[in-house]
């Protein structure tokens, strides 16, 4: 919900947080942070087939919810490792999209902020599906991406952005980890 009027800038009345009547704990209706990595190798993109609802059976980018105090870059690397067995180091942000987690509508408690990174697949390491996480993993060329996609509110836009990024250099904005670098990063050329 917006906090200010888009026309005049005046503050808008904000709804109070949802509060538990039993223990008085407040629950804010903020978006849940999620992170994923567009893992590529030789021009192909690694996708996973979801093993669980929502969107069970649909193709998705490896990713998931960020843990408490987990940097999105770390979450993206962890999710790729858990779902595919690959060790990657996300190197640049592709973009961010807001969406609903569940297919039954944009309920305020299901809103997600999805942060996607580029990552190169290491060497010739084979990706393998962890059956506790995903049903299948597969590599797809940019012009052969599957039609059955999870999260249709944002994933098609993510894949369009990935395809477009493959045609230009630099691909995206480099991401800074939690640590402040000892020196300024080299400018992107």
Regions found by a protein language model. Give the residues of each.
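Acidic, metal-coordinating catalytic segment for phosphate/diphosphate chemistry
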Residues: 1-36
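Conserved N-terminal beta-strand and adjoining loop/helix that marks the start
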Residues: 22-46, 65, 118
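Conserved beta-strand segments that form the floor/walls of ligand-binding pockets within enzyme
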Residues: 7, 19, 46-47, 60, ...
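Conserved Nudix-box catalytic region and its N-terminal flanking loop in Nudix hydrolases
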Residues: 40-82
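A short N-terminal helical cap/helix-turn-helix that marks the beginning
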Residues: 161-167
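Unchanged
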Residues: 66-92, 97-154, 158, 170-171, ...
């Amino acid at each position: 919900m917006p906090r200010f009027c888009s026309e005049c800038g005046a503050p808008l009345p904000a709804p109070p947080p949802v509060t538990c009547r039993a223990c008085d704990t407040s629950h804010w209706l903020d978006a849940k942070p999620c992170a994923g990595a567009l893992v590529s190798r030789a021009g192909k993109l690694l996708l996973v087939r979801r093993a669980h609802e929502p969107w069970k059976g649909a193709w998705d980018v490896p990713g998931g919810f960020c843990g408490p105090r987990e940097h999105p870059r770390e979450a993206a690397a962890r999710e790729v490792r858990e779902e595919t067995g690959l060790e990657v180091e996300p190197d640049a942000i592709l973009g961010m999209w807001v969406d609903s987690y569940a297919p039954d509508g944009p309920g305020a408690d299901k809103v997600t902020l999805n942060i996607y990174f580029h990552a190169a697949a290491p060497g010739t390491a084979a990706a393998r599906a962890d059956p506790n996480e995903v049903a299948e993993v597969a590599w797809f060329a940019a012009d052969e991406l599957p039609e059955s996609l999870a999260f249709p509110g944002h994933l098609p836009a993510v894949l369009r952005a990935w395809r477009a990024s493959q045609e230009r250099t630099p691909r995206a904005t480099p991401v800074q980890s939690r640590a402040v670098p000892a020196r300024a990063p080299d400018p992107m050329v």
